[in-house]
Amino acid sequence: MMIYIGFILSIVFVISFVGFSSKPSPIYGGLVLIVSGGVGCGIVMSFGGSFLGLMVFLIYLGGMLVVFGYTTAMATEQYPEVWVSNATVLSTFILGVLMEAMLVLYMFKNGEVEVVFEFSGMGDWVVCDGGDSGVFNEEIVGVSALYSYGVWIIIVTGWSLFVGVLVVLEVTRGA
């Protein structure tokens, strides 16, 4: 059941980014990015990384909401463009949703969802060792995981925030 929840969240995640990439208006783009950020953190938390999901969501809300508030105030339109007001925007959105639907059908046809990454050094995460078995708690090792194994998450998050700022500036420049 948890795999299906993660799969549905990833579908909503991709569709929300398709909605943002069709960029009808900065107001709706900011809203869709906030929703996709929340869904992305839900994906991280559904795989057991509650501390990392919370950290990413706090970083995202702290950084991007300020940027979107400023750019939305600077690019206020009397009649903001929606996804169905332009044929090009609507066709881009429909094409992205159809590609996501084809991916979903392909995944259901094969009947398997594989995890992309594997932890090779699980011994580093063990908190209580009882001979042949070890128990680890995700909350206790969350901070150490963020700064040791999760360094790439911090780098990708920082780079994504930087690219997001550039995209928002590009979207609002033409308005």
UniProtKB/Swiss-Prot annotation:
Organism: Rhinoceros unicornis
Gene3D superfamilies: NADH-ubiquinone/plastoquinone oxidoreductase chain 6, subunit NuoJ
Swiss-Prot/TrEMBL catalytic activity: a ubiquinone + NADH + 5 H(+)(in) = a ubiquinol + NAD(+) + 4 H(+)(out)
Matching Pfam families: Oxidored_q3 (PF00499)
Transmembrane segment boundaries: 1-21, 25-45, 47-67, 88-108, 149-169
UniProt family annotation: Belongs to the complex I subunit 6 family.
Function: Core subunit of the mitochondrial membrane respiratory chain NADH dehydrogenase (Complex I) which catalyzes electron transfer from NADH through the respiratory chain, using ubiquinone as an electron acceptor. Essential for the catalytic activity and assembly of complex I.
Translocase recorded as keyword: yes
Subunit structure, as described in the record: Core subunit of respiratory chain NADH dehydrogenase (Complex I) which is composed of 45 different subunits.
Cellular localization per UniProt: Mitochondrion inner membrane
Name of the protein in question: NADH-ubiquinone oxidoreductase chain 6
Principal subcellular localisation of the protein: mitochondrion
InterPro entries registered for this protein in UniProt: ComplexI_Subunit6, NADH_UbQ/plastoQ_OxRdtase_su6, Nuo/plastoQ_OxRdtase_6_NuoJ
Protein EC: 7.1.1.2
GO cellular component entries: mitochondrial inner membrane
Topology class, membrane: Multi-pass membrane protein
